[in-house]
Amino acid sequence: MWVVMVNRVIVPDSIESINQKYNRTMGRAFEYRKARKMKRWGHMARVFTKIGKEIEIAVKAGGSDPSANTRLRILMQNAKAENMPKENVERAIKRATEKDAADYKEVVYEGYGPHGVAFLVETATDNTNRTVANIRMYFNKCGGALGNSGSVGFMFEHKCVFKFKAEGVDPEELELEMIDLGVDEFYVEEDGISVYAAYESFGAIQKWLDEQGYEIVSGESVRIPTDTKELDAEGRESVERLVEKLEEDDDVVNVYHTMAEEE
């Protein structure tokens, strides 16, 4: 396994040594947080619901043909990576084309949780009044407060992350090519390559990967905190309670916060 940081290539002795050396990088911190979220959800139903809503939004915005709708195409690849049955994907596409289809909107909410930890909550909802009322209730019950738009958004970097397969490629040469596309973190792993870049580079990176013939495994938007806050065990528990409350809501797609990850 290789890890290539911009303008630098490091060949470690093992995967474990990579994790120890780079567990503070933006991308790796996001991966650890995502893994814990999946563990909390405990089953794939929540993941399928999330992807299904995103597919419906993409179809309404750009049509049901994945060859002409780049967002839909990447979501279908994400669904495959999560082992979402093909029938579920087809149903989501069909629902979006029906006359009485739910009109989902993507809305981001911002606020502060316990101990001044900043929260950014991404939702996909067909009823914003219901969603904002529920989210405000979760914040209030857990010792936090829902804020105004822009109140904490500046504390997070909006990034895109792609995972793709590129067998038989020189990682140093590939890294140099992708730097020109805006990539600032580059990982070569046993099952493929992961890259991170500013979200504005999403379309350019997806187009380039398609043109080069690389198999895209997944592509998504993420929010990564620019700074984090250390908390003791009791503080962490109170923040995790709010995270769990938010993630249990069917309208919530992603929850990001500025609490530091455990060592």
Task: List each language-model region with its residue ranges.
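Short terminal hydrophobic/aromatic SLiMs and anchors at protein ends
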Residues: V9-I18, Y22
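Positively charged, low-complexity, intrinsically disordered RNA-binding extensions
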Residues: V161-E263
